[in-house]
From Swiss-Prot:
This is Potassium-transporting ATPase KdpC subunit. GO terms for molecular function: ATP binding; P-type potassium transmembrane transporter activity. It is a single-pass membrane protein. The chain crosses the membrane at residues 10-30. It comes from Shigella flexneri serotype 5b (strain 8401). It comes from the Bacteria. InterPro entries: KdpC (IPR003820). It is found in: Cell inner membrane. Keywords: ATP-binding, Cell inner membrane, Cell membrane, Ion transport, Membrane, Nucleotide-binding, Potassium, Potassium transport, Transmembrane, Transmembrane helix, Transport. Part of the high-affinity ATP-driven potassium transport (or Kdp) system, which catalyzes the hydrolysis of ATP coupled with the electrogenic transport of potassium into the cytoplasm. This subunit acts as a catalytic chaperone that increases the ATP-binding affinity of the ATP-hydrolyzing subunit KdpB by the formation of a transient KdpB/KdpC/ATP ternary complex. Its main location: membrane. The system is composed of three essential subunits: KdpA, KdpB and KdpC. GO terms for cellular component: plasma membrane. Belongs to the KdpC family.
């Protein structure tokens, strides 16, 4: 019985620290230092939430830039089912999926002159990626220009405006957020 009291008091102390103090402290610091990120990096138009800057959306129309394929099968870009496809590079099923995606992209983008960018046919590790390279966005310009009756120049400028450079110049590559880019594309029509 004498060993029960120190064990119980240690348990209660650690429960208070790890279950109360630490979560409250990290939440408060997150809200203070990074309020936008701590609240989900939500993209708002007025009072309406249009998406998150961290999670891709399933844009499928010809008038939109398409992002990386989602690995969340039943409902694309479902954050509750996040995860990669887990198919190895040597798996024939992955080859079939990529071939089908290439064929679909070629059919939807007949005016594209170069090879299909790799990130448009391969899912990210999370299956929710919202970024593609500016080159992958530019590859889609002819389709979008035709669907929205916009000039190639307008779309090129839009991609340049929404492209983000890596934090460190030689580590990483420039990316463009598909959700933000497509929302800006919708504003061009207004």
């Amino acid at each position: 019985m004498s060993g029960l009291r120190p064990a119980l008091s240690t348990f209660l102390f650690l429960l208070l620290i790890t279950g109360g103090v630490y979560p409250l402290l990290t939440t408060a610091l997150g809200q203070w230092w990074y309020p936008w990120q701590a609240n989900g990096s939500l993209i708002r138009e007025g009072d309406t939430v249009r998406g998150s800057a961290l999670i891709g959306q399933n844009f499928t129309g010809n008038g939109y830039f398409h992002g990386r394929p989602s690995a969340t099968a039943e409902m694309p870009y479902n954050p509750q089912a996040s995860g990669g496809s887990n198919l190895a590079v040597s798996n024939p099923e992955l080859d079939k999926q990529i071939a089908a995606r290439v064929a679909a992209l070629r059919a939807a983008n007949p005016d594209a002159s170069t090879n299909v960018p790799v990130e448009l046919v391969t899912a990210s590790a999370s299956g929710l990626d919202n970024n593609i390279t500016p080159q992958a966005a530019a590859w889609q310009i002819p389709r979008i220009a035709k669907a929205r009756n916009l000039s190639v120049e307008q779309l090129t400028q839009l991609i340049a405006k929404y492209s983000q450079q890596p934090l460190v110049k030689y580590i990483g590559q420039p990316v463009v957020n598909i959700v933000e880019l497509n929302l800006a594309l919708d504003k061009l029509d207004e």
